[in-house]
Amino acid sequence: MAQKPDGGAGLRGFQAEASVEDSALLVQTLMEAIQISEAPPTSQATAAASGPNASPQSSQPPTANEKADTEVSAAAARPKTGFKAQNTTTKGPNDYSQARNAKEMPKNQPKVAFKSQNATSKGPHAASDFSHAASTGKSAAKKSEMAFKGQNTTTKAGPSATYNFTQSPSANEMTNNQPKTAKAWNDTTKIPGADAQTQNVNQAKMADVGTSAGISETDGAAAQTSADGSQAQNVESRTIIRGKRTRKINNLNVEENSNGDQRRASLASGNWRSAPVPVTTQNPPGAPPNVLWQTPLAWQNPSGWQNQTARQTPPARQSPPARQTPSAWQNPVAWQNPVIWPNPVIWQNPVIWPNPIVWPGPIVWPNPMAWQSTPGWQSPPSWQAPPSWQSPQDWQGPPDWQLPPDWSMPPDWSFPSDWPFPPDWIPADWPIPPDWQNLRPSPNLRSSPNSRASQNQGPPQPRDVALLQERANKLVKYLMLKDYTKVPIKRSEMLRDIIREYTDVYPEIIERACFVLEKKFGIQLKEIDKEEHLYILISTPESLAGILGTTKDTPKLGLLLVILGIIFMNGNRATEAVLWEALRKMGLRPGVRHPLLGDLRKLLTYEFVKQKYLDYRRVPNSNPPEYEFLWGLRSYHETSKMKVLRFIAEVQKRDPRDWTAQFMEAADEALDALDAAAAEAEARAEARNRMGIGDEAVSGPWSWDDIEFELLTWDEEGDFGDPWSRIPFTFWARYHQNARSRFPQAFTGPIIGPSGTATANFAANFGAIGFFWVE
């Protein structure tokens, strides 16, 4: 029973005032009351054993008659379990420890039901421990069952509680025929103000006395622990208070140790029933029918059972196609060569034959079809049409069907009168039968393989020459403005910016512009790339003295001539390292900005490459990557290898023939260039005669006011945005200068190189640029 905090003083006063005799008498009275209330009246045997500290008044020695009665009742009852007394030692006001003490009884005593408890108090404030041996009532064999309850109550009062009352649970030895076990309740009550929490768990265990060295009993006195591990279980319901959290633990078959951890105990022997197994009415896939399958929680495949594969129905047997009876052939003819048509024949509409046509060979045309001929087919020379074959009346031939030239028509083959011949169907050398005189042979006969192209061209449409010439003059001004940056001009740009709606006659407009450039300014329009259609402006030999002159690009062109010579002398290609090494000998370094040339690296790798003077590419299979320089497309048209070789020989005071390999290569290239120039001049003259381009194209007023500067890009307009600053010469002054110097006797430009006779003028010009050749 829990007491208030001031109740602790009353217990201490009771302990101090009570004498030893009163305490012993109180203990004896309590023991007798417990024995009288619990033991049956017919077979009650009381045995009390006092400890060494007990007083003589607390226990009386039994007489001889009482001992005899005790032995007779013990032999009749045959108790199974002996209880061990507990020895409780109190070491301090807040420290409690219990130790089990089993005392050895004399051998002359056959059975001892209870053992006394030894209570020792240490210190002035030691707690008083009252331990009472529980009495065990011996039940007779006729009793069906007996259950005893032992209560263990531990009460702590106040923060310095020092009293601990412990009662060992009373247990009854059950016989083999008893169906029920004893239950024990452990109630622990704690006052809210207590400092410590104590759990006192006392369990009644069945122990094997025969194996204990401290307890000796006669046969049948102690209960043997069965081999299957069955033992009395203590079912307890505990309430554990930890701070502000309370949880209730129902310990079923759980054994607790002193540290508080839990472990699962072995199940007692006996029949037990598992959870019901759900039953499914559907069979699993592949299972035999009419079988009730049970699906446990963890289903395992029975040994040896395998899922049966679903039976596949064999495909229905298809009947073989009906055998077709071959038609009877009339007059079979052996083919000597396969039928190969020169061009494929594509029918526009399906041809419906009125009657099945039987060919001399093994071919039967059943229904309308898209008939295609095999190219290269030639009819055999001995082939003849069947005499009774006639073409259908409403049959029309394909529009582009071409007959082989040596194919002979059958004599009795008649065409319908209203059958139109497709264009380009009948070759010119094909003989016309006599009965074809009523047809129109002349428009359909072709004279050459390119007759379709000639028909598409047709007669020249009437055009306004003045409008075409006006558009050509605008193109001339446009080309001269675009060529200022030396970037090749694309044909698509000319069509987009100038020609525009005259796209169908753009070849004539371009040719008229070329004629004006040559006659007025001594400039030639060259197509350097036939695939991308790139055009450049180069000077003609008649205007070499005036077109170059001295401009801001003269130093760059001189450096370009030196670079082209280095590339040519190194096998038409020079790596970047070789080129820069040669330029260093001339005082030019890639990291130093030149006052006239600017950034040398940008000039070589960007400007000259964009202008198509040089070709800058990576060396194949180079690791780390290396780059090399080659001649560009513009360099092949503005100069030649022979001119570059003469320039090198002039600088080094040597003969060009000293470099035999380079001289032979340059000579071959010069001959090829002459042949190409002659063929181009002939083709150009023929085209101009066909177009009617003559001196009237350059006659008439010429004005620069209609120059469309808005067509120029930002890069083409220049740094200051002044379109006129891009013109390197005065147009009319240059025109008159070119007119006076039609056939110059000496070359004064460094880009062209020296002529056959070296002049001091060339050396002076090249020396003024500041470049010197270094071996």
Swiss-Prot record:
Main location: cytoplasm
Segments for region (22 X 6 AA tandem repeats of W-[PQ]-X-P-X-X): 293-441
Subcellular location: Cytoplasm; Cell membrane; Nucleus
Disulfide bonds: none
Region (Disordered): 37-330, 374-407, 437-463
Bias kind Low complexity: ranges: 39-50, 375-406, 437-452
Tissue expression pattern: Ubiquitous and in the seminiferous tubules expressed in Sertoli cells but not in germ cells. Expression decreases in all tissues with increased age and is detectable only in brain cortex and lung.
Matching Gene3D superfamilies: MAGE homology domain, winged helix WH1 motif, MAGE homology domain, winged helix WH2 motif
Ranges of compositional bias, category Polar residues: 52-63, 84-100, 150-180, 223-237, 250-260, 297-330
One function term, GO molecular function aspect: identical protein binding
GO BP: circadian regulation of gene expression; negative regulation of DNA-templated transcription; negative regulation of epithelial cell proliferation; negative regulation of protein localization to nucleus; negative regulation of transcription by RNA polymerase II; positive regulation of apoptotic signaling pathway; positive regulation of branching involved in ureteric bud morphogenesis; positive regulation of DNA-templated transcription
Pfam families: MAGE
MAGE domain span: 468-666
Subunit text: Interacts with DLX5, DLX7 and MSX2 and forms homomultimers. Interacts with UNC5A. Interacts with TRIM28 and PJA1. Interacts with NGFR/p75NTR and RORA.
This protein's name: Melanoma-associated antigen D1
Species of the source: Rattus norvegicus (Rat)
